[in-house]
Amino acid sequence: MVANNAGQPATPADLINVDEVIGKYYDLVPDPEVPEQRVIFGTSGHRGSSLKTSFNEAHIIAISQAIAEYRKKAGVTGPLYLGSDTHALSGPAKKTAIEVLVANGVHGRVDSRDDFVPTPVVSQAILTHNRAADGTQRFEGEGLADGIVVTPSHNPPTDGGFKYDPVTGGPAPAETTNAIAARANQLLGDFKSIKRVPYEEAIKSEYVEGFDFREHYVDDLENVIDFDVIRNSGVRLGIDPLGGASVNYWPLINEKYGLNIGVVRPEVDPTWRFMTIDHDGKIRMDPSSPYAMKGLVDELNAGAWDKYDLVGGTDPDADRHGIVCPNWGVMNPNHYIAVCVEYLFGGNRPGWPEGAAVGKTLVSSSLIDRVAASINAKVIEVPVGFKWFVDPLFSGEVAFGGEESSGMSFLRKDGRVWTTDKDGLIPDLLAAEITAKTGKNPAQLHQEQVERFGESWYKRVDTPTTLEQKAKFAKLTGDDVAATQLAGEDITAKLTEAPGNHAKIGGLKVTTKDNWFAARPSGTENIYKVYAESFVSPEALDKVLDEATVVVDKALSE
């Protein structure tokens, strides 16, 4: 259900009190006996709010100590790259982490400009550090680096987040995050094992080193994007960083590569007062949401399109992207993925490994499969979460990984790994490359794909639930679906494992020739999500969703 104020400008009542949010970070102490106050890692680390005693100083002390102990046991002896975004809680949490990491003798690399550092920039720094002399990636041996990014991604301004990237540069696997969370929760109940020094001492110690993340990342971008094509075409690219960590990267990209990039809204404000309200009535900095991006779209339609041929967006930690085209608005991430797949695998990356696959999550559109099949590209379908692309991108088995929630990354032009975490900057730049090379923007190319492969209707519905009900999703099987048809079509598969890697999906996916739905719990919120798509009609999509809800509710009630 869409909130009445969705798409409307934020009002004073919608804004956080920054001093209160930061004050509660230090003042409130979590009780490890209360489930909601424990350390819980979702697909992207620990997230919560200081106001709800779910993201406080004690959490970060415990998690940082647990990470220091984990990397020691794992034999990680190189530097730890530390990034953070523009959320109000990110600065305090970053300082807390430095206090604990230094006390544990961890060599940390922080931004030499004291700037925000996006998620993909940390991933790229880890991977380039861990590259062997012959250009291959190392994941074993002395001197390997890892990292931490302090971010709740596009979550509301009240929230904080803290995630660990191991030596492979991307989201940590479940066995790693589970071990860190278990140790952190032990420490929450007993701080005796924690080492910590005051920040003023820690930041000046031999264990903290400045590193120019921005220049390191921007200098390397030419190995991923064809800047010559963009520059020679004169394509005018607008960028809205949504008040996030990429804000100071775009001017350097523009200057270094001689492009025509303009930053539409360069302000950084931890209240995000310049945003329009998202679908659920909250301020959420999601560059793929038509509601959150309505303020930008209105500004463009009021005359700013005179300056730009297309506009890209990034979220607070710049791991998600959004593409806005004239006479179209915000593109559906599924549609943009399909356009990228056809462009990249259709002859524009000749240096990629032969046979490297398209990686997609199982809740992404089947349009991607149809496009890939038309150019003989293999598709590997994995569970939700970018962590499932880490190893395939690392090895080159997958050349492109994309998910419906506007996260993607892809290989360098020479076929080596770029990042193993989502990168919101390169999709925006790729949109400019695609426009320059084809003479058509991504929305126009999507319309051509619809003519060839058919139109589809896609929707996600979120439903409140409990921790107990969320746990039941892991027990769902194909037998829980008694029906033989879905929206009038014969069911062709009832999946509890992803076909691409046979990993458990933590829920259920049911498919027919032209319809499908998938149901799974959120990793960070007490909701479950039902995704559905139909290539038949909007009415068929509604029927798919109705029948999916019956299946899920019946399974959860047993």
In which residue ranges do the predicted regions lie?
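Ferredoxin-reductase
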Residues: 2-13, 75-170, 369
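Catalytic-core signal marking the mid-to-C-terminal active-site face
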Residues: 440-558
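Flexible hinge/switch segments at interdomain interfaces of large molecular machines
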Residues: 33-43, 195-198, 263-270, 523-524
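Phosphate-binding chemistry for phosphorylated carbohydrates and sugar-nucleotides
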Residues: 12-15, 20-27, 101, 108-123, ...
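Metallocofactor- and cofactor-centric catalytic cores in central/energy metabolism, strongly enriched
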Residues: 57, 116, 121, 516-518
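Short beta-strand segments
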Residues: 83, 147-153, 313-316, 401, ...
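An N-terminal, well-structured beta->alpha segment
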Residues: 2-103, 128, 199, 203, ...
